Amino acid sequence: GGRMDAEVMVGGSGKGDHPSFMALTLASDALKEIGFNLIVSDMSNFAEMTNAINAGTADMFAMAWQATPDPDMFQIYHSQGGSNEKSYWIKDADLDELIMMARQSTDQTYRKTLYKQCLDIVADWAVEIPIYQRQNCVIFSAKRVNLDTVTPDITTYWTWYNDIELLDLQ
């Protein structure tokens, strides 16, 4: 048989405030029922975690990253990208080619299609498990701002200040 334990390092400053910390703690409790010990280590020293990742000694880790509205996947997933070389170790010529094709185009619809293919490949590699999608909350006072002029579809990638020139103040 294989190992019946694994450590997952969480980059939450040792305070349990990383969004994945609670989910991993609950998963650890559930896995104990079937005899697997998932050790959740909330790292107070981020350098200790990145050193383990870079050395290839981390079983698993939970960190967060965000992308721009038109993300460039090179740094995270390309074979020669900075994060991939130390975190994922993906060496996939098809993935590399798709990433480079996307980098060479300014057509966002085309890039979106390529990025979808890239993410399908990454999912097949099973090197990461999406745990959450961050959402921001923005509050405006109707006494101070004409709400009809606020960006209608605010996302984490397109915020109200991207259309600040359209805002009417009361």
What are these regions, as identified by a protein language model?
Residues 1-67:
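Ligand/substrate-recognition segments at binding pockets and active sites
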Residues 1-15, 61-64, 106-142:
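Bilobed periplasmic-binding protein-like "clamshell/Venus-flytrap" ligand-binding domains
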Residues 19-33, 48, 52, 57, ...:
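Extracytoplasmic/secreted proteins, especially bacterial periplasmic and envelope-associated proteins
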